[in-house]
């Protein structure tokens, strides 16, 4: 089931195992069980430290990743290929005794959790957000015997996942716990465990502190570190919104990559320099005093720096119409690559006629029964090559001059109301899902009017990435820079870094 290149890479990784690992599989006579057995047999044959046995588990097909004679609580229900193959490899290594690449403070938090925690995560193999959650919960299960975790492929266990319309969907002890991407710190925070503020309070002041973890942040950090400046990053996750991007084909010199690969490479590049990357934590306030610029974190810690570069990026913009908020993750979605497979053979709408909206409609057309694309303007704004491809699809309708007015449904989406701007008539379209692709909303709510914002909530900057507050710079999608592209954000981050360096020299 694995190609030659992947088998070679896996064989090398399995050499890092520090102890024996046993796959305990629950198999039936169905095709998926046969596929799973073939996969596990193929992997087991690659290392003498691996073995395979069979036992009836809660779900079939499924398997646990155990130490001989010891259950770890790590279970995969389905066949973990696609984006989840890395989750399987990491589970094997960690169960074998390989030390995780996680801060000791996080490991200590996991060990201190008391009680019984049985997590179940519903995923799709095309979901780029899902592996982060699966890997975090698997690691927690390996570290703390009070925790167990099962990854469940919704495409295999359709009856269980019938009412799940967004992934990853996490359940704890049978109750809904959370949806969407979550870091291990997010999960711990939801469980009531937070990082000790003293870990941050004892840090020396920085020359440059960068808030945010996306392309602009990474570029800025590398440039300031190369200048010999003491550099820190405060971010929820390295890569930012790019983590949720499927294909990237316009990053010059790289013909094609994915958001997760890009983010992984960015993190590796940052690690090559003396950069204090503090991830899994968010800033909640910023203030300039006579002594320094102070950034307050969500745990109450305060960091000080000579300069700050704000690169907090942007998140999905919502429609802000009745019914939308209460039906998010119940048919209203923002990531077609993650949630598209959950709407197989169903009718969906895509809202937005720009590149993102048209690309989403094209991708979904290959999965769902029918796509209706809504655009408020009189014509689509996407590139012509994308429009041509969209119009060639037989199961896509395009509605321009269409104003969406209400998402219809009780416990899940059943339709959408829209107004024909030409006639003023209102229509109801019955459907199962709505993918919102109307642009991004800058992450500036935490700034509390510390710097000047425009009417769209973006940070106002000049050509040198200065804000209206000396020493505070901004770069990337969080700013009023017109074009929002990865490559432009990276250039902006470098520009902000060089001007921060110049500011420090002159002050």
Curated annotation (Swiss-Prot):
As to how many cofactors bind and how, the note says: Binds 1 FAD per subunit.
Give the GO terms filed under biological process for this record.
cell redox homeostasis; response to reactive oxygen species
The cofactors named for this UniProt entry are: FAD
| UniProt entry tagged with the keyword NAD | yes
Q: Which InterPro entries match?
A: AhpF_NTD_C, AhpF_NTD_N, Alkyl_hydroperoxide_Rdtase_suF, FAD/NAD-bd_sf, FAD/NAD-binding_dom, Ferredoxin-NADP_redctase_2, Pyr_nucl-diS_OxRdtase_2_AS, Thioredoxin-like_fold
Which pairs of positions does the record mark as disulfide bonds?
335-338
Quick one: a GO cellular component term? cytosol
Q: Where does NAD(+) bind?
A: 347-361
EC assignment:
1.8.1.-
- Please give one Pfam family short name: Pyr_redox_2
Which UniProt keyword terms apply here? Answer: Disulfide bond, FAD, Flavoprotein, NAD, NADP, Oxidoreductase, Redox-active center
Q: Which GO terms describe its molecular function?
A: flavin adenine dinucleotide binding; NAD binding; NADH-dependent peroxiredoxin activity; thioredoxin-disulfide reductase (NADPH) activity
Q: Does the keyword Repeat apply?
A: no
Q: Which residues bind FAD?
A: 207-222, 467-477
Q: Which domain of life is it from?
A: Bacteria
Query: Which PANTHER family has this protein been placed in?
Result: THIOREDOXIN REDUCTASE 1-RELATED-RELATED
Query: Its family?
Result: Belongs to the class-II pyridine nucleotide-disulfide oxidoreductase family.
Comment field (misc): The active site is a redox-active disulfide bond.
Subunit relationships? Homodimer.
Q: What does this protein do?
A: Serves to protect the cell against DNA damage by alkyl hydroperoxides. It can use either NADH or NADPH as electron donor for direct reduction of redox dyes or of alkyl hydroperoxides when combined with the AhpC protein.
Checking NCBIfam families in the record gives: AhpF (TIGR03140)
Know the name of this protein?
Alkyl hydroperoxide reductase subunit F
